[in-house]
Amino acid sequence: MRLIVLKVQGVSPLYATWRIDEWCRPYFSYYGANWTSLYWCFNQCIPVWLITSLILLNNDLKSVGFWYSFTLLYSPWAAMGLFPVIFIYVAYRLFKDIKLMLSVLTLQNIVFPLFVLLVVGSFYMSNRHPLADCGWWWKFEQPMVFLPKYIAFILLELGIYFYAMRNELCKSSWLIISFVVLLFIPFYKMTVWNDFMMRASLPALFIVFMYWTRWCMRNLHSRRMLIVVVYVVTSLTALQLMVNSLVDTVRAGKPVLTNANERFCNTSDLEVVKLGDGQFFAHDYKTTFFWKYLSR
């Protein structure tokens, strides 16, 4: 599929193995591979993965809201993606046994999340500039143009895993919920590069790939070896990203100078400056609730 897409774009097939998880660009956004997320936003994905793991391991509901609230401190978009996963799971558990309601209504599930929401929410609301390219996909494309892309994307990104693990679905509500959430995330877009889709998908993708890894470990025999081989081939992304970092370091011969070493958005690209100024800087911040009551 990536070869076909690149051929249409006029790109050499030799490039086909580079960043396989981005096969659908520029026709659609993408779900980042685990190593891609580590490469570009390790400060977000590692905490989110750890928090998701804690929630999965903690089978009772007494602290699910407590652990969830930590995602707001690291990645608000990932928090948006994890919220429906937890909400549906808790609702499902309560539907099966309403007596669990007392387990949900605990101090740590109510007080701490509200406190974090107050601090983090007021901080982000200090920037009153609207996000560029924010809204439902049909705001940017006609439905009949979007839907074929969406169907192809879902079939190729999730279809293989769904089919392979179809027998696992009836055993795990976490897996079913994660697939459902991943079906809906592509319908909304935030920022030019659609950071929402790449970050909000982190928790659900992590859950899916944990189950996928377990499935592979249980099925390493010849009849299903082809699927495992395909999974190994896609790991080229991790190797390429590591090589990319090593090569850049060797070429530089010293720490690579980036905008972070000087000033954020210190570039001659006016579009980047305009985007960064609106998305990452809070103007008139001294009039905001966060500055007046929380920051000092």
Tell me what each language-model feature is:
Residues 56-71, 99, 109-110, 176:
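Short hydrophobic alpha-helices at membrane interfaces in multi-pass membrane enzymes
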Residues 2-16, 42, 73-168, 172, ...:
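Transmembrane catalytic cores of multi-pass membrane glycosyltransferases
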Residues 224-296:
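Intrinsically disordered, polar/acidic, low-complexity terminal segments
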Residues 52-60, 84-96, 209-217:
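Hydrophobic transmembrane alpha-helices
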Residues 26, 30-34, 41-50, 83, ...:
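Membrane-embedded alpha-helical segments of multi-pass membrane proteins
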Residues 35-36, 53-54, 62-87:
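Membrane-interface alpha helices of multi-pass inner-membrane proteins
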Residues 195-218:
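Hydrophobic/aromatic-rich transmembrane helices and adjacent perimembrane loops
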Residues 1-55:
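Conserved catalytic motifs of ABC-family nucleotide-binding domains
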